[in-house]
Amino acid sequence: MTNAAGSSSALQNRFRTHYCGSLGPVLQQEKVSLAGWVHRIRDHGGLVFIDLRDHTGICQLVIQPEEKELFEQASHLHAESVIAIEGSVVLRSPETVNARLASGAIEVVVSALTVESNARPLPFPVADELPTSEELRLKYRFIDLRREKIHENIIFRSRVSSAIRRYLEERDFVEIQTPILTSSSPEGARDFLVPSRLHPGKFYALPQAPQQFKQLLMVAGFPRYFQIAPCFRDEDARADRSPGEFYQLDMEMAFIEQDDLFEILEGMFRHLVTSMSKKRITAFPFPRISYRDVMNRFGTDKPDLRIPLEIADVTPLFVNSGFKVFAANTKEGCAVKALVLKGRGTESRLFYDKAEKRAKELGSAGLAYIQFREEGLKGPIVKFMSEGEIASMKEQLSLETGDVVFFAAGKWEAACRIMGGMRTYFGELFTLDHDELSFCWIVDFPMYEYNEEAGKIDFSHNPFSMPQGEMEALETMDPLELLAYQYDIVCNGIELSSGAIRNHRPDIMYRAFEIAGYSKEDVDLRFGHMIEAFKLGAPPHGGIAPGLDRLVMILRDEQNIREVIAFPMNQQAEDLMMSAPSEVTTAQLRELHIKLDLPKED
């Protein structure tokens, strides 16, 4: 458990004068009062030892055999019973010192014991932390939270939140709470709807994010806003995403440019990493990589920069190639991407079969490769390649004997993503340093993309981002060449947040939406309150909202987001402990003017 401060007047009451984790040799012969949970209890031939646990740690209690009444009380105790004791601190003999405990040099000889609550047998042990099903852990989460690792995770999360608040307040940010009941926004993920009793047939929505409120705060004259905000989205669970509810550090700043926000966030992350963990940041300031560049080099806009592999574009090599499949692709405007694995050219056939299976899972028709072996070239496309093509390839990719190069072809983005998926797959061959945090910014996202299914131009990402070049760019450039002031922050392949410099100009907003096929009336109908606010004096502004849950996951080396949330739902968006969601009474539904139309059971 995490150590806390020692005795203080604030904690001196009838239950305790000290915390378990604060006891040490300096308190020898002092009388103390302690309270907590029975972690373990052992009878050693007349001596009873109790490991007492509170939120700061564990200390050992001793009940002497001559203390008949205490001995009798202890004989009826179960693990996780709650007790309060009085006793004297004594030094342990040298051979019994427990170096694993902060209080391991002492023990407390008990003179009085009160059983506040005797626990019945537990559904799973706390002390031994044996493997336990997630269903059982979530049903009895209050017991699971007593376990050392998850207990420390929750305390650590609290400290991260406090450190964030201090850091931002020192830089003139103001913490402001925004509404939990708001209007529905069907353009995003599915909303959680809340029926209104006072307005029959109408619904509130729980906010997916405080996006519009924080922008309105900029209009209201609060130039630096933040809150650790609850957000609600009716979406499926993943290992790094909790269904239903999550928390984000919501931030917005007025009169800034992109680099101003980067400086604030980079400084905050560096402060958190250096002050709260043993991890280290690879590069500071964080590298900036354009969307086009990150896709070409890593095949994803969420790259794990610890993986020592980069993708190469070899399209020109195949324009007139004897390998007709790739040559035909290049003539259709497609790209050919390559990935080199140094020293892996002699792997077994099983290695290549597994790699091809993964490539097909990523959407590729197959996986072409060439092995550069001592005895010559091997691979499914070698026979189609001329000596000149091989020589050019070796020169461009710095290939040597013992290497292997893999290829993927297709439309630019598809080829990039297939090879990016293979880069991540092959990344498992390397031992990545879990104490290294490789942050980067992804910038210069495209403003628009072509929706082939709809046959029209759509917004690529956030429609409220300011286009680079503003109105002039919208009027003069090919929409598919336009870039937005939008950015993502990524760490070790995990996207922590997206953000943007906002479009605060109604004239630019109308034109940006017009290019995507929206009329002025459409924009006013959907976003009229924002447009109206911007017409009444809106400063340039931008923001970001890193996920608190994911940040704590990274700092604590957790693979599952439920390990850093006190009361998470399961994968099916159920709270097993509170039995939510649950049915409600007919009277409750009638009061809300709701009639159920449930799907028929199979």
Swiss-Prot record:
Binding, L-aspartate: 187, 233, 461, 502
EC nos: 6.1.1.23
Keywords, alphabetical: Aminoacyl-tRNA synthetase, ATP-binding, Cytoplasm, Ligase, Nucleotide-binding, Protein biosynthesis
Q: Where in the cell is it found?
A: Cytoplasm
Known Pfam families for this protein?
GAD, tRNA-synt_2, tRNA_anti-codon
Q: Which GO terms describe its biological process?
A: aspartyl-tRNA aminoacylation
Gene3D superfamilies registered for this protein in UniProt: Bira Bifunctional Protein, Domain 2 (3.30.930.10), GAD-like domain (3.30.1360.30), Nucleic acid-binding proteins (2.40.50.140)
Q: What is its main location?
A: cytoplasm
What reaction gets catalysed by this protein? Answer: tRNA(Asx) + L-aspartate + ATP = L-aspartyl-tRNA(Asx) + AMP + diphosphate
The UniProt entry, under InterPro entries, shows: Aa-tRNA-synt_II, aa-tRNA-synth_II, aa-tRNA-synth_II/BPL/LPL, Asp-tRNA-ligase_1, Asp-tRNA-ligase_1_N, Asp/Asn-tRNA-synth_IIb, AspRS_core, GAD-like_sf
Q: Coiled-coil stretches, from where to where?
A: none
Q: In which residues is ATP bound?
A: 233-235, 495, 547-550
> Which domain of life, per UniProt?
Bacteria
Molecular functions (GO terms): aspartate-tRNA ligase activity; aspartate-tRNA(Asn) ligase activity; ATP binding; nucleic acid binding
Q: Got a GO cellular component term for this one?
A: cytoplasm
Region (Aspartate) location: 211-214
Q: Where is this site: Important for tRNA non-discrimination?
A: 44
Subunit-level organization: Homodimer.
What function does this protein fulfil?
A: Aspartyl-tRNA synthetase with relaxed tRNA specificity since it is able to aspartylate not only its cognate tRNA(Asp) but also tRNA(Asn). Reaction proceeds in two steps: L-aspartate is first activated by ATP to form Asp-AMP and then transferred to the acceptor end of tRNA(Asp/Asn).
The entry's family comment says: Belongs to the class-II aminoacyl-tRNA synthetase family. Type 1 subfamily.
Q: What is this protein called?
A: Aspartate--tRNA(Asp/Asn) ligase
- Which gene codes for it? aspS
